Amino acid sequence: MRISYYIESTRGDERRFWGGRKWRRYISQAKHYNAAGDALRAHKAICEVGYQTNVVAVGMDRDGWPIMSWDVIKVNGLLEQQTKIKL
């Protein structure tokens, strides 16, 4: 099944996405976040129905892009499963 994602709203450093039936959002704690396109692509790549993601900028690379830490939490199972992915 293919899921389409759209940026629904942007308020400060919080962005919300519509992915199929569920609202999903990520919050960047970086003061200057200029990688919204890359974050959206990563979000689409790792997020499926029943999963929520939370992304946090944990540093900056040599080119000034944020180094992101993703929390992927499964919400439709009996146990929540959480993993972290460095992008």
Regions found by a protein language model. Give the residues of each.
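Conserved aromatic
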Residues: Y33-A36
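Short aromatic-glycine-(Arg/Gly/Cys) micro-motifs in beta-strand/loop hairpins
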Residues: M1-Q29
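Short, mixed-charge low-complexity intrinsically disordered segments
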Residues: L40-L87
